[in-house]
UniProtKB/Swiss-Prot annotation:
EC number: 5.4.2.12
Active-site residues per Swiss-Prot or TrEMBL entry: 60 (phosphoserine intermediate)
InterPro entries: Alkaline_phosphatase_core_sf, BPG-indep_PGM_N, Metalloenzyme, PGAM_B_sf, Pgm_bpd_ind
HAMAP family: GpmI (MF_01038)
Pathway where it operates: Carbohydrate degradation; glycolysis; pyruvate from D-glyceraldehyde 3-phosphate: step 3/5
Organism: Gracilaria tenuistipitata var. liui
Pfam families, sorted: iPGM_N, Metalloenzyme
PANTHER family the record matches: 2,3-BISPHOSPHOGLYCERATE-INDEPENDENT PHOSPHOGLYCERATE MUTASE (PTHR31637:SF0)
Compartments reported by the entry: Plastid, Chloroplast
Name under which the protein is recorded: 2,3-bisphosphoglycerate-independent phosphoglycerate mutase
CDD domains the UniProt entry points to: iPGM
Length: 510
């Protein structure tokens, strides 16, 4: 049985349009040669093909979940939005319960989350639905808005803040109390100084230079501070105190965990925190199964992701990524399961400690590649998942030149990976989870920092049997796992409704 090396180039979409396309502009001789020499196809990685609304760009969480699942799963964005449409959201027991408690104690409800329509970590419609419920109880509501600028345009937050203002301006008991860029409130790389600034602003009633959120944002814009980097600033009094309640309304967990842990973990050591009496906390989805807090939309259990199938056959597997994407090749790839499966090893390569990744576009790709080659050479793993974060993380900075540098670095790394695969007669699969680096200038020639809806490449490179396989067209990310299982000659579980990309007789399902 050959080993399968699944290499995910995060944020590497496919488009023939060269304008603002770091991937087309960059010099990538290795990947170009592999694309031209081996079976390849394009996979849809956005919208309904990955369980998102039509036209919604894909993202790393959804992409890795879909790849690991081998099926299309309705994502939390769709699940929650549908509950708003069918009105079941407004009868949600956990949400109504926390509002009742605030009403009983005559205290404050704090709504904390990313305020945009990006749809990657949150959606502003979910905030408005929460406001609809909370307003029934006539309680004091403090909105703590996190500005985006990453999954939306860098200077687009005023639209969303104005939308919130229009909803609440007639109510004296509802205020936008703080605003903070996601750089501070949604760090996921243990940059505790960032999280601490956000945390302290939530706790202290020290007012900033204005109570007008639009004026405040404009002042930061004048200093060339975009939405993502707006410093945590207080606009109105309404700090978090005893007997208050908090609803964190991001549906994606990875970038809210640090802030939530600061309020909930007794063993938290990131920075000095305050202990609260009777502070009720609710998250829209499950952020961390180890936390003893209420969840409005508990995770649905899924079984027979590819990692579980590999483990059931007693085969060893390895997940390898740097910090920024470690959760994606482990937690998300395994369907929201924190603990590794039997025979599953994990290796974390620390991401560089820089303010933004355009300052170090190579990130930790060299160390990651060295670790991957060592693992391939051991020949003990039948399935290795590698994630290169550079195209996505550098692409998010909007710096085209830095992203081109990142792409060229990845190409050099893939050359080394491919040489190792050839030496060990291992199969190399190159693909991606979503687009980003392929679309870095918008229609106005302004930097675009968000993901694209472009398809992603899929290359099946085998050192031998070059002409054995043909790959079908019109596939999506859910088709990757069945393809790998067929290559390994393992049975495909019934739960996987993805279809193998190999144009040969399909393996029987179990």
């Amino acid at each position: 049985m050959k080993s399968i090396i699944l290499t995910i180039l995060d944020g590497w979409g496919y488009s023939e349009n060269k304008k603002g396309n770091a991937i087309q502009i960059a010099d990538t001789p290795t990947i170009d040669k592999l694309w031209n020499s081996y079976p390849n196809t394009l996979l849809n990685a956005s919208g309904r093909d990955v369980g998102l609304p039509e036209g919604q760009m894909g993202n790393s969480e959804v992409g890795h979940t879909t790849i690991g699942a081998g099926r299309i799963i309705n994502q939390d964005l769709v699940r929650i939005s549908k509950s708003i449409e069918d009105r079941s959201f407004f009868n949600n027991e956990a949400i109504n319960s926390i509002c009742q408690k605030i009403n009983f104690y005559n205290t404050k409800l704090h709504l904390i989350g990313l305020c945009s329509n990006g749809g990657v970590h949150s959606h502003i419609k979910h905030l408005f639905a929460l406001l609809d419920i909370a307003m029934r109880y006539k309680i004091q509501i403090c909105i703590h808005a996190i500005t985006d600028g990453r999954d939306t345009s860098p200077y687009g937050s005023k639209i969303f803040i104005e939308e919130i203002n229009n909803q609440i301006q007639q109510f004296n008991h509802i205020n936008i109390c703080t605003i903070s860029g996601r750089y501070y409130s949604m760090d996921r790389d243990c940059r505790w100084a960032r999280t601490e600034k956000s945390y302290n602003t939530l706790l202290k009633n020290t007012l900033g230079f204005t109570k007008d959120p639009i004026l405040m944002i404009n002042e930061y814009y004048k200093k060339n501070i975009s939405d993502e980097f707006i410093p945590p600033t207080r606009l109105h009094k309404g700090s978090i105190e005893n007997n208050d309640g908090i609803i964190f309304f991001n549906f994606r967990p990875d970038r809210m965990r640090q802030l939530v842990h600061a309020f909930t973990k007794s063993t938290f050591k990131g920075f000095n925190t305050t202990s609260f009496h009777n502070l009720e906390i609710l998250t829209l989805t499950q952020y961390d199964p180890s936390l003893d807090i209420e969840v409005a939309f508990p995770a649905k259990k899924n079984k027979n992701f590819i990692g579980e199938i590999i483990a059931k056959y007693g085969l060893k597997q390895l997940r390898l990524a740097e910090t920024e994407k470690y959760a994606h090749v482990t937690y998300f790839f395994n369907g929201g399961i924190e603990e590794p499966f039997a025979g599953e090893d994990r290796q974390l390569i620390p991401s560089p400690k820089v303010e933004t990744y355009d300052l170090d576009p190579e990130m930790s790709a060299t160390k990651l590649t060295e670790s991957a080659i060592n693992a391939i050479n051991k020949n003990t793993y039948k399935f290795i998942v590698i994630n290169y974060a550079n195209p996505d993380m550098v692409g998010h900075t909007g710096n085209l030149d830095a992203t081109i540098h990142a792409i060229q670095k990845i190409d050099k790394c893939i050359k080394k990976i491919w040489l190792a695969c050839q030496a060990m007669n291992s199969t190399l699969i190159i693909t991606s989870d979503h687009g980003n680096a392929d679309y870095m200038l918008d229609e106005n020639n302004e930097p675009c920092t968000s993901h694209s809806t472009n398809p992603v490449p899929f290359i099946l490179a085998e050192p031998t049997n070059i002409h054995t396989y043909h790959l079908r067209k019109n596939g999506n990310l859910a088709d990757i796992a069945p393809t790998i299982l067929q290559l390994l000659n393992l049975n495909i579980p019934n739960e996987m409704n993805g279809i193998s990309l190999l144009e040969t007789k399909a393996k029987n399902k179990i």
